[in-house]
Amino acid sequence: MERVGPLATIQDLGRPGWFDSGVGTAGAADRASLRLANRLVGNPEGAAGIEVLLGGLELVAQRHVTVAVTGASAPVTVDDRPMGPASVLEMEEGQRLRMGYAATGLRTYVAVRGGIEVAPVLGSRSRDTLSGIGPDPLRSGDLLPVGKPPRSWPIVDVAPVPALGNDLLTVRAVPGPRADWFADAAALFAGEWSVSSDTDRIGARLDRRSGPDLRRSVPGELPTEGMALGSVQVPPSGQPVVFLADHPITGGYPVIAVVVDADVDTVAQARPGQALRFRRIE
């Protein structure tokens, strides 16, 4: 690693099965983008790659490697030669990959054929930024070991995926389980929300952009209960938080709705200031 932007971490698809020990799943915030990057280089979908916040990454190949970059639309060059989005590239020893800053989207993924083979913790190579479990965030000077290439080979050179935009996002959510704690839970689905600058891998915090406020009808707080990926928790401020990859496994604020699993990746790519609305499904 020659240079690291705001944050770069090693991520795979997480460490499920440890909730009873107080450990969350973590893993890639945008799982679809990591899976795609791995498929492009012929890896199993859950192989560890690099998750880059906004961009600013620079790395040098120490030997021949096959790489793919997916997710946010950060410009990528290899020895100053532009690399297309969601495409496969062969890098030779000494070649330099530079990633600029994304114009749209928030997180970019770099997969290397063979996967990043840092030491696993509880069965996963993912960094959990809430608990501190897993490999440290990447720093300049880090040398990343690459695993043995799989027997399967890449079958395409590029994946035709739509570019992420800065337009209004529509996110599907199921009401409940604590919708009855609110005077009008339908207010969540009315008007628009804006992604707050106070957003990270733990959760996407939202500010009201237009529409009615969320008002509680039940005073006090809940006994601590389990929290799931995509839970929309509402603290006393009335500003909802959509729980992302590194979310706490328990919480005491009511969950007004749960974002469907397929749309959690969309929320994880939403930039601060971007408009968002919830669409109710049953």
Regions from the language model: what does each represent?
Residues 1-282:
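Conserved "landmark" site that anchors the functional core of diverse proteins
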